[in-house]
Every structure is written in structure tokens, then in C-alpha cells.
Amino acid sequence: MPGSTTITEQAVPTFHHGRHEHGQNFLTDPAVIATFVELVTATRGPIIEIGPGDGALTVPLARLGRPVTAIEIDARLVQRLRCRLPSHVEVVSGDFLTHRLPSHPHVVVGNLPFHQTTAILRPLLHSFAWSDAVLLTQWEVARRRAG
């Protein structure tokens, strides 16, 4: 079974809005980004990032030196990310909902698009290969899933 569930309540005051049809809200708060990366640092293994957007999390995660696969649905962002990131970061152009997760242990991370949170969590919660997940979601979704 995947790692234990921990919910941290923290206000996220600053977002930069992306494309509405993709539910994009880009995280820009440096304190939240630092806390997020700190949580990921406590994990082991390759990292799968859902919806890297403009790379606010991807860039500092790449500095950890671990393999990172960032799955981005917005083709206009994929090319920009590929130009900005080192070679150990693979940027995949596609929808996470149709992406095949690896069968080996990995860490799932992401600032989930609000309108897709439940659709993303369903397959994750039924996958047994991931060891840890660090996900930023709406408070209501986190409470409902954690019981």
C-alpha cells in the first residue's frame, strides 16, 4: 500500500492563472513552493509530476538530482519546459489521465487542476506502485478523501 496520508492545511494566497479549459492555476508563492519541495525531499525514488505548468515546482524538484517525469497537457508549455530543464527531467506532452504510470516505486507530486482532482485521484488511489504522494488540492477534496 502507498505511503501514509498526511494532510497539511495551508492557505495558498498567490496563483497565476493559466488556461481555464485545463484548470490551470500556477503556483507562485515561494513559501508554499519551498514547503512542497521540502516534503518531496523527505521521499525517495523517481518523481512523477502531474501538470507542471510553468515549472514552479519542476525547477526546484529538478535540483534534487532525481529522475523527474513531468506530464503536461498544454502543448505550449511543454516546449518551454523542455528548454528550461536539465536532461534528467523528461517532459511528456499529454494528459495524465491517459498516461501509464510506472510499475516500479515512484513519488507522485503536483498542484492538481481543481476541476480534475477527483478524476486524477481515482486511478492514483488504485495504483500500488507509488510510494508517496505530495499533492496540492482543494481543502474540501482533501477532507473528503482523508475521511
Label each residue range with its predicted role.
Residues 1-147:
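Catalytic cores of RNA-modifying enzymes
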